[in-house]
């Protein structure tokens, strides 16, 4: 289709964020952009339970979560399951490159968030995306899947 929209690889997003206002804003922004937000949670256990019951194309996760476990452990679990995870944080962990497909630095705007998900989608499709300010892509495509 010459001028049509390209088919998205990332449609179903799981949001994991410990700040309620940020979680709400992310959910609204992504739903408005046409993504299916399968769930929004603030801790590791709820995130894993959502992964057990839902098909997820991408996890959008902060590093700091409610409870004892962190986004780092969630990224390890996501990697085992073959689900790409994009960190959204102001302080990415030293080993983020080994765990996630990339990182969008906080604070970010609605536009940056949407552009970041589009860039991840293009990356997963094998394309060289234009990266918005604050986004770094880490993983080769095959490492995310």
Predicted regions and their residues:
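Non-catalytic signal-transmission and effector/linker regions of two-component phosphorelay proteins
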Residues: 1-12, 109-145
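Conserved acidic carboxylate
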Residues: 17
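Two-component/phosphorelay signaling modules centered on CheY-like receiver
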Residues: 20-39
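Conserved phosphotransfer microenvironments
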Residues: 61-79
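A Lys-centered signature of the CheY-like receiver
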Residues: 106
């Amino acid at each position: 289709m010459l001028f049509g929209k390209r088919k998205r690889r990332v449609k179903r997003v799981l949001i994991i964020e410990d700040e309620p206002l940020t979680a709400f804003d992310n959910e609204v922004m992504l739903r408005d952009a046409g993504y299916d937000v399968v769930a929004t949670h603030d801790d590791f256990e709820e995130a894993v339970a959502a992964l057990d019951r839902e098909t997820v194309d991408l996890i959008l996760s902060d590093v700091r979560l409610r409870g004892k476990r962190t986004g780092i452990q969630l990224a390890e679990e996501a990697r085992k399951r073959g689900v790409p995870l994009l960190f959204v944080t102001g302080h990415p962990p030293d080993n983020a490159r080994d765990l996630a497909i990339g990182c969008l630095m906080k604070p970010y705007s609605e536009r940056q968030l949407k552009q970041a998900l589009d860039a991840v989608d293009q990356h997963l499709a094998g394309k060289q995306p234009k990266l918005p300010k604050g986004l770094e892509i880490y993983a080769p495509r095959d490492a995310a899947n």
